[in-house]
UniProtKB/Swiss-Prot annotation:
Lineage: Bacteria, Pseudomonadati, Pseudomonadota, Gammaproteobacteria, Legionellales
Entry keyword annotation includes Protein transport: no
Protein name: GTPase Der
Protein's organism: Coxiella burnetii (strain RSA 493 / Nine Mile phase I)
UniProt record, GO biological process: ribosome biogenesis
PROSITE patterns to which the protein is assigned, alphabetical: G_ENGA
InterPro entries: G_ENGA, GTP-bd, GTPase_Der, KH_dom-like, KH_dom-like_a/b, P-loop_NTPase, Small_GTP-bd
Amino acid sequence: MLPVIAIVGRPNVGKSTLFNYLTKSRAALVADVPGVTRDRQYGETTIDSQRLLLVDTGGLVDTENKEVAPLAETQVEQAIDESDCILFLVDAKAGLVPADEIIAERLRKKGKKIFLAVNKADRARAAVVQSDFYKLGFGEPYVIAAASGRGVKDLMTQVLENLPEEKEVIEKEVGIKIAMIGRPNVGKSTLINRLLGEERVIVYDQPGTTRDSIYIPFARNDENYTLIDTAGIRRRAKIQDYVEKFSMIKSLQAMHAADVVIFLLDARQGVTEQDLRLLNRIVEAGVSLIIAVNKWDGLNIEERDNVRNAIDRRMPFVDFARRYFISALHGTGVGKLFRAIQESYQSIQQELTTGQLTRALEKAVAEHEPPLVKGRRIRLRYAHLGARHPLTIVVHGKQTKSLPQSYSRYLANYFRKTFNFIGVPVHIKLKTDPNPYEGQEER
């Protein structure tokens, strides 16, 4: 699971500035989807090859006229409780204020590793600033300037060195990892109960994990699977007994740990903004996607047509994902999900050589050439596999920076069709070949 770092502090100390500085490397990887409100409180970063999930707690609540509100709000409490460590941010210019001391006292009770960072500090006053905040009791404060990044590298290096070790390990034998993602009360617990409780399904405890584990290994028809429990669905004494609550952090962690995501929609409620935000996150994660529309049996023909039309209209950015209309309660259509999981997983495991991808690129260009730039055709030379999770195909050529987004989408769809990627978002990464004459003087 991705380690979770919560950024905590009173309003206007620079939490969002630090969050934006740390996550800016992600901004260019995935374009915003038209019509989808981006959820910017959660972001990823990679530091020294370690991926991290960051939570800007200031973005989780309206803090206007609430000096210590961020820590008191339920969402923020949940984010802190689910984090692996905390970046406690204070303001050097304002100095130590009572609100900082109140937050510090509350954080101490959490039993988490806490890093105190003093933001907006001048280099010349670093020693003075540190002494002011020593009394908070979190050891030597880290003096940073979030806007410029000064001191942030040293801070994050210490964070990495103090992350807790992974408590649970998924072994290869547990097979395909499945995450169930969806809003509260769309039927996730019912569907999980159906998946685990059907005939011929063997549920077993994995050695070294507790009954409360977020990993639930099971087998069906001699195939091994592991269900990654996302939204607080915890096993009690019996498999059939569940309690559900929504956690964005656990959902994001599960997306990145899974091989396949089943995204559950409630047919009676249609497509909501929260559905779109979650789907956008899944596309960013690059994981194989299956869409299951639940509670389908309770709709008449007209209502079903309306739901299908709403999905087509509001979810075109996931048109690569297969849809299944099911009833988790009665089991209708649930069996098809296992076949879909197998097909989606197998499609992403296929070998993809540079030769295969380059030949597909050549055919794509022959069928639909890139546009002209200043009278010259953009040339795409070859392609290779950049990453498998998320599936990233790197395309090399000349003037690729001028290639429109629409053509990148065309290439992604062409590769998906050519190699029969089932339910897999394809990311295109463009690289421009170096100009051999650049830097030479004209004669």
